[in-house]
Design a protein with these regions (language model features):
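Substrate-binding cleft and catalytic face of glycoside hydrolase catalytic domains
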Residues: 63-198, 202-224, 229
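Short, acidic/polar
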Residues: 47-66, 141-151, 233-245, 314-319
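Active-site beta-loop-alpha junctions enriched in small/polar residues
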Residues: 37-39, 78-80, 112-116, 164-169, ...
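Boundary/entry segment of secreted carbohydrate-active catalytic domains
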Residues: 26-61
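Acidic-and-aromatic substrate-binding clefts and catalytic sites of carbohydrate-active enzymes
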Residues: 42-43, 50-57, 79-91, 169-172, ...
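Hydrophobic faces of well-ordered beta-strands that scaffold small-molecule active sites
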Residues: 30-36, 73-75, 107-111, 160-164, ...
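Aromatic-rich peripheral "rim/lid" segments of glycoside hydrolase catalytic domains that contact
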Residues: 44-50, 179-188, 272, 276-279, ...
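Glycoside hydrolase catalytic-domain groove-lining segments
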Residues: 59-62, 200, 215-226, 231-302, ...
Length: 375
């Protein structure tokens, strides 16, 4: 394990300290996947539930994706979903998880530790947990995590990977587990400070969740992923995961979101982040969320591909090529129901990403980093 010292409020890695290397890291296969938590939702973005088809025959989204090489699938779970949120309760997650496992897919469980969306702007404590002391909250995170995994295991839907929290760049279970990103005023309240006490809370929450997941799994524990956003931001990634290393948090996968529409950087930024993570932490790297939809700011320099079905395919080919060449273990597209399908329910161009990767010479000029070239 590496050694860290605190200097002027920051973490410094001691050069020459022994480093833990993840056994077999280089040989792990790459996987293309998707977050399909919306699959059985009655409506997506105001549209009625879609009927899928291919080659003139009605089919299931999961089956079509797997037929085209998409083999990993992510499902989110809320504690007690509020009416405004999708009903991603554990009870509703189990049937879809069983379908993934029965089809031979890899299953990533995304535990939000909230009754609704948890992301860099929202990390609300579940209503039933709000009056707990911090010690009791820590214990509840562990027991809840254990119960979720044990229930899935008993239902024949054991996850292969588990995210302990979703996009927790600013922590989780606010305000008790909230931390504040240095130099990112848009992320932090004006009075925010990156205090030792807040980091202590976040570390204890993460360790409790990890203990619970492993206890619920028994002798076949899933791999643990820690997920933050901004996959092209090495400075924030280093700041966050250095804290976890200093506290000896035991996890397996660095998972990050990468959305050009949300100014997460270019593919060159992502490449730098991934290669620096490999050098510094020796963990597997997963792009746990991505997507390519219209940008929220017209001057966004990261929007290098047309926002069209063909442009989305170009983006996915470039992204997958970059992540594979950088040694990543996978890419997961968020909510493919939104924009990877044609209006008639047939698969759009990006569904065929892996087919196009077989002959990159036939693709238009790409936006991959200079280090990425060739098939």
């Amino acid at each position: 394990m590496r050694s860290f010292v605190v200097v002027a409020g920051g973490l410094v890695l001691l050069l020459g300290a022994p480093r833990r290397v993840l056994s077999g890291q280089a040989s792990r296969p790459f996987t293309l996947g998707a977050d399909i938590s919306y699959l059985d939702a009655p409506a997506v973005r105001g549209r009625a539930h879609r009927t899928y088809q291919e080659n003139g025959k009605a089919d299931d989204e999961l089956s079509i994706l797997m037929r085209h090489g998409w083999t990993s699938f992510r499902l989110r779970v809320f504690v007690s979903p509020v009416r405004e949120a999708p009903d991603n309760s554990l009870a509703n997650t189990i049937p879809l998880a069983r379908r993934i496992k029965a089809a031979g897919g890899t299953f990533l469980l995304d535990i939000h530790y909230s009754d609704t969306w948890a992301d860099p702007q929202h990390q609300e404590i579940p209503v039933a947990w709000r009056d707990l002391s911090f010690d009791s909250l820590e214990a509840r995170v562990e027991s809840y995590s254990r119960e979720v995994i044990r229930t899935l295991k008993d239902s024949g839907a054991m996850p292969d990977w588990v995210q302990v929290g979703n996009e927790i760049t600013r922590g989780t279970l606010w305000p008790l587990g909230q931390v504040h990103v240095p130099g990112a005023a848009q992320y932090n309240p004006p009075s925010g400070s990156d205090s030792t006490a807040q980091w202590d809370h976040l570390i204890r929450i993460l360790k409790a969740g990890i203990r619970g997941v492993r206890a619920g799994a028994g002798n076949t524990p899933p791999r643990i992923a820690i997920h933050i956003d901004r996959g092209g931001d090495w400075a924030t990634t280093e700041w966050f995961f250095d804290h976890l290393e200093a506290a000896h948090v035991d996890y397996d996968i660095i998972a990050q979101s990468f959305y050009p529409p949300w100014r997460h950087g270019t593919l060159e930024d992502l490449w730098k982040n991934m290669t620096e993570c490999a050098r510094r932490y020796h963990k597997d790297f997963l792009v746990a969320e991505t997507g390519y939809e219209p940008t929220h700011s017209p001057d966004n320099p990261d929007m290098l591909w047309p926002v069209t079905p063909e442009g989305r395919l170009q983006f996915m080919v470039d992204l997958v090529n970059t992540v594979k060449k950088a040694g990543g273990i996978g890419v997961m597209y968020w909510a493919p129901e939104w924009d990877l399908w044609n209006a008639d329910g047939t698969p759009g161009p990006a569904v065929f990403t892996l087919d196009h990767l077989k002959d990159l010479s036939a693709r238009p000029a790409s936006h991959v980093p200079p280090e990425v070239s060739g098939p």
